[in-house]
């Protein structure tokens, strides 16, 4: 029997490929960040640990990392930094941009806010600018926060500010100009869609429709804007962009037994109010301004006796349009409540729009321009002193330290109130699809601006340790 054989020729070759890698450094060979492998971090109470030797869960963020973005305070700079740290922003208004922190999620039923320390003292993180901070250390597990007891149950955020450097001198000036956008603006229906939906809802409830077909046609055509309005209250009241300016100058250095760090910061923001300069002599813009002045001193009294002094002063002012009892007007609440078909923003004669039907909701555009403004002033002083004595002559590793701190906080309120005339025209009869008779409604009165001011909060706190 004849057998067939299949012969398959094969050619074996070797393919050589070259790969290019980045320059080798200590980070690649050792598996640790080269720059920070010998870093010592403060975990509180003058206790420090080397990162490479620590078994605690600690994450450290450095100034050169978080200070790459324009931010109101150090809290806003920590978005996306620090493993285990969750940062939530609750407001788009610059003055209220104070995020909430969680470390490793929610820890308890009562409170979930971590303990915030600034140079070892419990203080508000929003009072500190990014420029004056050296490091932010996040303590996450039980081993890391053990020295804080019950207060550290939700984790600890320890902020260390900059200090001077022996035998050096440095002057630094920075300027940031930033823009903010309303990224998630709500969309509201036009007046014709609103009127149709209102009629449908009334019919479903077995009631008479509110708008006639002639009125629906008027809303759709836009032929009578002062009688049947179609107002974009959001677009009329707010603009799309705000502007921020941050000026910072710092002085850093020292001699053989003395170190210093001094910083002055000025932050200003003009918000989203569309036309705030409609009045003589004042603006109704949503504005925020703050000045931070910090001085950190380190003095070597003797070879074993060290004195540390920190002083931070803050002046801030917040302006909001409209006047209310210790607060500005809630324009967003008005915009959400008022439909586009309610009344025109302004009448043909220049009077602000308003109606008896919507008497409970004011014209947000009128409030943002013609109802004056409210101001909040905050005055804050933080001062602390730490004296450290090395007692290693008695026994190696022995030392003693004492700390004294003083916090002073005051808040002042100014209410500048002003009223205005408002009104609207209503159609009472139609003829061949055209309004044939109208009535005029008016209310309110034009008043001069009145002012009231008082101190609404004053706090002084002393700490000894």
Model-derived regions, located:
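Membrane-proximal, glycine/serine-rich, low-complexity loop/turn segments characteristic
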Residues: 20-39, 46-100, 104-115, 121-126, ...
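Cleavable N-terminal targeting peptides that direct proteins into the secretory/outer-membrane pathway or into
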Residues: 1-33
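Entry/capping segment at the start of metal-dependent catalytic domains
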Residues: 130
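Compositionally biased regions
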Residues: 17, 28-31, 257, 351, ...
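Small-side-chain secondary-structure face that scaffolds active or pore-lining regions
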Residues: 265-290, 320-322, 378-382, 393-465
């Amino acid at each position: 029997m004849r057998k067939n054989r299949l012969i398959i020729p094969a050619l074996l070759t070797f393919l050589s490929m070259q790969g290019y890698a980045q320059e080798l450094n200590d980070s690649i060979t050792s598996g640790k960040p080269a720059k920070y492998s010998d870093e010592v971090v403060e975990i509180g109470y003058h206790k420090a640990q080397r990162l490479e030797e620590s078994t605690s869960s600690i994450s450290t963020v450095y100034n050169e990392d978080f200070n790459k973005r324009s931010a109101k305070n150090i809290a806003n700079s920590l978005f996306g930094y620090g493993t285990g740290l969750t940062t939530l922003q609750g407001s788009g208004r610059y003055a209220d941009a104070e995020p909430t922190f969680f470390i490793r999620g929610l820890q308890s039923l009562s409170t979930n806010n971590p303990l915030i320390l600034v140079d070892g003292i419990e203080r508000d993180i929003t009072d500190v600018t990014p420029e004056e901070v050296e490091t932010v250390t996040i303590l996450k597990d039980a081993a890391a926060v053990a020295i804080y007891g019950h207060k550290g149950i939700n984790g600890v955020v320890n902020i260390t500010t900059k200090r001077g450097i022996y035998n050096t001198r440095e002057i630094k000036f920075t300027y940031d100009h930033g823009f903010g956008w309303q990224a998630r603006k709500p969309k509201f229906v036009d007046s014709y869609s609103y009127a149709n939906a209102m009629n449908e809802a009334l019919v479903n409830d077995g009631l008479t429709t509110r708008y006639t077909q002639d009125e629906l046609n008027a809303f759709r055509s836009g032929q009578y804007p002062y009688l049947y309005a179609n107002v974009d209250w959001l677009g009329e009241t707010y603009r799309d962009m705000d502007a921020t300016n941050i000026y910072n100058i710092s002085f850093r250095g020292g001699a053989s037994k003395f170190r210093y760090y001094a910083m002055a910061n000025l932050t200003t923001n003009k918000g989203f109010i569309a036309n705030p300069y409609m009045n003589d002599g004042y603006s109704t813009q949503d504005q925020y301004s703050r000045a931070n002045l910090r001085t950190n001193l380190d003095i070597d009294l003797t070879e074993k006796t060290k004195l540390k002094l920190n002083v931070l002063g803050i002046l801030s002012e917040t302006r909001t349009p409209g006047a209310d009892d210790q607060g500005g007007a809630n324009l967003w609440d008005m915009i959400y409540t008022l439909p586009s078909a309610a009344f025109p923003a302004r009448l043909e004669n220049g009077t602000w729009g308003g109606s008896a039907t919507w008497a409970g909701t004011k014209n947000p555009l009128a409030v943002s321009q013609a109802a004056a403004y409210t101001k909040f002033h905050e005055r804050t002083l933080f001062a602390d002193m730490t004296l450290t004595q090395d007692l290693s002559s008695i026994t190696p590793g022995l030392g003693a330290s004492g700390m004294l701190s003083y916090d002073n906080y005051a808040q002042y309120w100014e209410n500048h109130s002003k009223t205005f005339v408002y009104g609207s025209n209503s159609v009472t009869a139609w003829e061949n699809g055209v309004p044939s008779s109208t009535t005029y409604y008016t209310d309110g009165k034009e008043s001069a601006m009145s002012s009231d001011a008082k101190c609404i909060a004053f706090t002084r706190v002393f700490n000894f340790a």
